[in-house]
Amino acid sequence: RMDIYFPKSGTPTAIILSCPGGGYTFTSIPNEGVAVANFFVPRNIAVAVLKYRMPNKHEEVPLSDAAKAMEILRDSAVVWGVPTNRMGVIGFSAGGHLAATLVTKFPTQKSRPDFGILVYPVISMDETITHKGSCLQLLGDNPTQEQRVAWSAEACVTDNTPPCFIVHCQDDKTVMVENSIRMYQALTKHKVQAEMLLLPTGAHGWGFSKQIAQKEVFESAMMKFIYQNL
């Protein structure tokens, strides 16, 4: 299911697909979906909030949903008058893993986002830094090393990965900040445009509806990144 939010008037300058978090057990729609739309729509950016299927140890399911959603949005953009090269994805926590997977493992060119925004994302399935609950739901109880690598976004970055903006709090006790650091390093290695903002405090799960210190710094940097990639 995908709920789409449009500006009240005029043609949107871009469309962003929002992938809420929830540890691959549910989708945190209010905080990381509706609140996302409430932020972007007044800035003339349409938002599609994706309620993707849970993997239940079938790792390909969420990516299939996200890729299909991006293809639908790109096809629909022609009708809506939105340039088809202004299609981004934003993801939070486990939804950040889904967004990172989409920007690195997009199954078709049409499903490739033009930019990605990763907010306190789960990136790696490496057992030393992964979010164990997300890994369990995605890969099951005893994933092979091959599975861990295949679904670690940092291991899937290529020269064709789109530009990414990453934000994480250093005091995040739910998803280790090393996830974002590894993703940034992989993007840099492949010379992909990347920006990473590390905030000293804020913990996890604040989304777009909760205030944290330096929230305005994040919002300003993120919007600058988006405009640079439109």
Task: Show the residue positions of the predicted features.
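Primarily recognizes the serine-hydrolase "nucleophile elbow" in alpha/beta-hydrolase
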Residues: K68-S134, R148-V149
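Short beta-strand element of the alpha/beta-hydrolase
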Residues: T13-G22
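Short beta-strand-to-loop junctions in surface cap/lid or active-site-entrance loops
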Residues: M2-P12, W80, E154-T158
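Catalytic nucleophile-loop/oxyanion-hole region of alpha/beta-hydrolase
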Residues: S28-A37, A48-T84, S209-V217
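C-terminal catalytic histidine-bearing segment of alpha/beta-hydrolase fold enzymes
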Residues: D3, I181-L230
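Conserved alpha/beta-hydrolase "acid-adjacent" motif
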Residues: K173-R182
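Active-site nucleophile elbow and catalytic-triad environment of alpha/beta-hydrolase enzymes
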Residues: D141-C156, T161-P162
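Short beta-strand/loop motif that positions the catalytic acidic residue
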Residues: N160, I166-H168, D172
